[in-house]
Amino acid sequence: GRGMKMKMEKEEKMTTADPKATKETVELWNYLHAVAGKQIITGQHTQTIPCEEIAYIRQTTGKEPKLRGFELLGYSPNINYADASPECLTEIEENKGTAEMALQWAIEQRKNGNGGILTFTFHWFSPLGGRDKSFYTEHTDFDAREVLKEGTPERAAFYHDMDVIAEILRRFQEERIPILWRPFHESYGTWFWWGAQGPEVARNLYHLMFDYYTCLLYTSPSPRD
């Protein structure tokens, strides 16, 4: 009927939110859109650098997941090592170098024509510090609502950390490797600082990051330029 036709036309017009998305990003988006509701993409998050989960799957099935996930928590600029539990320190240590490993894996997948898909999760330690695993609400006094206000320490710290992570992600952009970027995960709950103040605040944090990461910023070395 007419309603189904309109729905199909709407689906056909779906595209990336960033009109300047790279060719590789658009190709990944089109692939995900094409398999949606028809196929299942198997994936596995890697908990540590050795990627023992992948080795187990390979040994058991003779195959590897098409999608592989990595964690960026070790790149948080404000980890309080002096007040971190042994568990926290172990988790940080086990995730050091994940970006480099992910980049190497993605390049190899492209070289071999395997079409691997890369996704990143970021357990973001509080931009203003805290105790132990300060991405947990109970371990930080960081108020995400303050990020949405101009001129606050929270906002400055938020943007500082985004700059740090942007430099990591830039390596993948230079290699033209798209990423399924997963910041502010589980924001429907209150256990992480980015979700502690409710879904609207979490949504606005995402919008800030999206705008900041997709807008082209130009700086000149000379006032005359």
Can you say where each PLM-predicted feature lies in the sequence?
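Active-site neighborhood of glycoside hydrolase catalytic domains
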Residues: 204-213
